[in-house]
């Protein structure tokens, strides 16, 4: 019987002891956005629920202030 072994994902923000996610930190936010501009879910990234909420809020603020694009491909 073959079992799928999945590596445990760790929350980067918990390990680095980051309390608040800043919307002006574009380099950090780009790691959690797909090529199309969607926010990557926590089941893929491994972030905890608290930080995922902060992350989505920060991405939405950065989009509103034109620091991040809503989508990459405009046609």
Curated annotation (Swiss-Prot):
InterPro entries cross-referenced by the UniProt entry: Ribosomal_bS18, Ribosomal_bS18_CS, Ribosomal_bS18_sf
CC annotations in GO: cytosolic small ribosomal subunit
Gene Ontology BP, a term: translation
UniProtKB keywords: Ribonucleoprotein, Ribosomal protein, RNA-binding, rRNA-binding
A Gene Ontology molecular function term of the record: small ribosomal subunit rRNA binding
Pfam families associated with the record: Ribosomal_S18
Gene3D superfamilies xrefs: Ribosomal protein S18
Family per similarity comment: Belongs to the bacterial ribosomal protein bS18 family.
Function: Binds as a heterodimer with protein bS6 to the central domain of the 16S rRNA, where it helps stabilize the platform of the 30S subunit.
Subunit structure: Part of the 30S ribosomal subunit. Forms a tight heterodimer with protein bS6.
Protein name as it appears in the record: Small ribosomal subunit protein bS18
Source organism phylogeny: Bacteria, Pseudomonadati, Pseudomonadota, Gammaproteobacteria, Enterobacterales
């Amino acid at each position: 019987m073959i079992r799928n072994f999945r590596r445990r994902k760790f929350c980067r923000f918990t390990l680095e002891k980051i309390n608040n996610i800043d919307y002006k930190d574009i380099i950090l936010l780009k790691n959690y956005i797909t090529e199309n501009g969607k926010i990557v879910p926590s089941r893929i990234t491994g972030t905890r629920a608290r930080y995922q909420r902060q992350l989505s809020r920060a991405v939405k603020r950065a989009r509103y202030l034109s620091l991040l694009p809503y989508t990459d491909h405009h046609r």
